[in-house]
A protein has these predicted regions:
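Acidic, two-metal ion nucleic-acid-processing modules in DNA metabolism proteins
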Residues: 20, 37, 78-81
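Short amphipathic alpha-helix segments
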Residues: 14-35
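Extended, charged alpha/beta regions that create polyanion-binding interfaces
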Residues: 58-88
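N-terminal intrinsically disordered, compositionally biased regulatory/targeting segments
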Residues: 13, 51-52
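Short Gly/Ser/Thr- and Asp/Glu-enriched loop/turn motifs at secondary-structure junctions
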Residues: 42-47
């Protein structure tokens, strides 16, 4: 890994969610701010995501997710790539 590497994170957690639409809006805005690309699926059953960006951006989104106790300690798969794997 070098400083120009793209950090790829993936994780999921089954957790009953009463307000998935509100969460989608909030996390979409945060991902846009951080220039993260990929997919984040949020439903009444939980969360599933595959995101890619800078180390700082991926660290920030994980910290942001963990501000919600329901998303603490999501097991992550972390890989690195030389290019951005997602178009949006």
């Amino acid at each position: 890994m070098n400083e120009n590497s793209v950090v790829n994170i993936a994780g999921y957690k089954f957790e009953p969610l009463e307000n998935p639409v509100d969460l989608v809006r909030m996390y979409q805005q945060k991902c846009d701010e951080l220039k993260l690309k990929g997919t984040m699926l949020i439903s009444k059953n939980g969360i599933n995501f595959s995101l890619a960006g800078t180390q700082q951006a991926t660290d920030t989104i994980i910290a942001f997710l963990e501000e919600d106790d329901r998303f603490l300690n999501i097991p992550l798969k972390v890989t690195y790539s030389e290019t951005q794997p997602f178009r949006r």
